[in-house]
Amino acid sequence: MQLTLNGNPRTFERPVVTVADVIRELALEGKRIAVEKNGEIVPRGLYADTPVDSGDRLEIVGAVGGG
């Protein structure tokens, strides 16, 4: 499957069906991240229920602490 991830084309060899699958493939489970799919924020509680299709654009950003 071909997705655009943070502005770069990315091919996933194993099937990814949901946003949760993408996060798992990227080893980001348990990390403090925010996900946007095709310009819409995906609430964390909906990652497993939000489908991804070839050609979708995902932006994934991590939280950065500071002071």
What residues fall within each predicted segment?
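Ubiquitin-like/PB1-type beta-grasp interaction modules and other compact soluble beta-rich domains
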Residues: 1-66
